[in-house]
């Protein structure tokens, strides 16, 4: 039974991402999770502009300046008997593409909700994405050290707006200045809250049982009585936790706490490691691949440039689907049809990188990329598979980009193509002129591109408005028809960063007319990598 150690390693893995609306406290939760995983000694809370103490997971220049997480970091740490891979996703509303792709690489998600605000727009969008793969969701109601909405109302809102059943695991006692702690329904115990302990793991003060007189003495008779009454209601009206429904993405366990006060995060982590699935099978075009298969397979879901300003490098983030990575192993780079020798893959602790000696199904490793790896690429040890479902979206916003110094056109193009390969932005080169058009899903992406062109490629660029409303990738099985379409639509055609033919429409009316005139041509709003 030589593969017992391998199976044990795979079953320990828990790979998840955090989804939330901007400012719901995601970066703070990431910090505290790392603190409990003993990955960092003290939590540096994210401060406003220019503060010197930055959250461990926000490490690019612009993120440090603005206090928002723009790129997906990967952090690995042990917790209980598991090895947890946490993928930190951009919380800012603009970064849906990067976030979306990250959600294709995880087996479960932690949804963080600001308990003062409830379900917000961004959370809805991200939940739609997790629905596509029925990803199991754990919920953390955050910011109980502030005044919050009624907890029952919050559960109702999650159920009705996100269409998922809620099973409360803990229940808050008071909130804001009156916040006293939580009652853990499964353990039948009250965990008391102490203020001012946000940077370290505090000793827990626990009161066993709901009818314990110590509870009244500690939190006050009124709050204790309120807790008992609320629990009677909650237990009568809400769902019990059901593992099977959770794994199907139909029910979410709900925890209450405050990430800033470092309270309740461990209960949520306990739930996540106990209940969330070990690495799941993944669908390839040819067949489903099980995590426990001994042959290595993996796919690239993100490329990031210049993680190390000292080295002009790019790292391709790969989710291992099955098997084991060992240093120096040979694998097939399926799209290019060639064997590669991977000797220097890295593992992550947000911006700190260490060489991976071995990594297993469920883990994320980084491959050094010198321009040959693209998002969606599959690597295998033998079988020629292609993992599916890593999409590119047609951008919704467009601008022309121009140089302050015209002599740097070559660097500009190189920078833009690299940034587009990494998914930071999309680039379109019209066939009829030398313009460069940048397409994004959100406004902030434009700022990121200019900032990164300056700091990483030493290119000063500015934007101008451009008459483009939308873009569609063009496909047609009939070469003659495609040729006719290209001849008649020269002014609206461009090549994207990967040289795919794209139709750039000045208005939606124009796009609809083109579709009517050329019914044989497909105009696609998404394109799989």
From Swiss-Prot:
It is found in: Cytoplasm. One of its GO terms (biological process) is regulation of translational termination. Its main location: cytoplasm. It comes from Vibrio vulnificus (strain YJ016). NCBIfam families: prfC, PRK00741.1, small_GTP. GTP binds at residues 20-27, 88-92, 142-145. GO terms for cellular component: cytosol. Keywords: Cytoplasm, GTP-binding, Nucleotide-binding, Protein biosynthesis. GO terms for molecular function: GTP binding; GTPase activity; guanosine tetraphosphate binding; translation release factor activity, codon nonspecific; translation release factor activity, codon specific. This is Peptide chain release factor 3. It holds the Pfam family GTP_EFTU. Gene3D superfamilies: P-loop containing nucleotide triphosphate hydrolases, Peptide chain release factor 3, domain III. Coiled coil: none annotated. Residues 11-280 form the tr-type G domain. Belongs to the TRAFAC class translation factor GTPase superfamily. Classic translation factor GTPase family. PrfC subfamily. Increases the formation of ribosomal termination complexes and stimulates activities of RF-1 and RF-2. It binds guanine nucleotides and has strong preference for UGA stop codons. It may interact directly with the ribosome. The stimulation of RF-1 and RF-2 is significantly reduced by GTP and GDP, but not by GMP.
